[in-house]
Amino acid sequence: REVGWLSPEVQAAVATYLDMPAIAVHEIASFYTMYNLKPPGRFKLTICTNLPCGLRNGNQSARYLQAKLGIGFNDTTADGLFTLKEGECMGACGDAPVMIVNDHRMCSWMSNDRIDALIDELRAAASDSPEPKQMGKKGER
């Protein structure tokens, strides 16, 4: 969380610290969507495409979001605002299709209209407040 992503150097340092093979760290980091292997946009949108969400138009919502943002999964918009990830089950199947913003905010029933409203809200939030600084040295902001 200090820099927002796990570079190969950070993964190697974690492997050394935990006394485990570097490939094991990479396997874990690449499996879970909360870990980023390249710098993410300001807003990371993770959309569920597993079966329950898929049966309730989750895949259509994912395609709509890709078209709206002009990016595919694991890509970031040119303005650096949005990164789009495909996620595994988020445990809210009754609210399908679901999406998580920045690994913390669950968004439910993500129809095209709700996606449009969310993107507008996030764009407005980005223009209202500057990008938060990344953490540098311990305690530095």
Q: Which ranges hold each PLM region?
A:
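Signature of N-terminal electron-transfer/Fe-S-associated modules in redox systems
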Residues: 1-141
